[in-house]
């Protein structure tokens, strides 16, 4: 049987997004909001905005290029679960950076009274969304806390989906002896 692989652009986008998400999920678990963590928080934001751009590219690529079919050996419930997990992964990979960006736009730096800036990798200034301009400090703080909760819960949901995705790939590779990992490699 011939191995049907993903296209090289799909593979590159998959692994770039995967590594970026892995960093941001790990940083979510170990960072706190203090001065020592600020450089890592800034990197977290830069990676999040990068993921947003990469996932948009991935969705456009996928719309124009049909991915390979799942192997015939997949059971119906595995096919259904695979489609559900992939759909939710795309949703969360898009929602996570977007919710972080909106949350940052609602933030106020204690020293300046302005929203925290986002400078992608300390090189490219990125803009905050004007959704909260003119809003009083208490309302902004309330939105920032609410959006922080949404971003945090979404992070846990994304982590669970990543575990399902990786677990499914490893199950098919090692238990079912299918060349699952080779399909998403160069």
Regions found by a protein language model. Name each.
Residues 1-186:
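Membrane-embedded alpha-helical bundles that constitute the cytochrome b-like, heme-associated redox core
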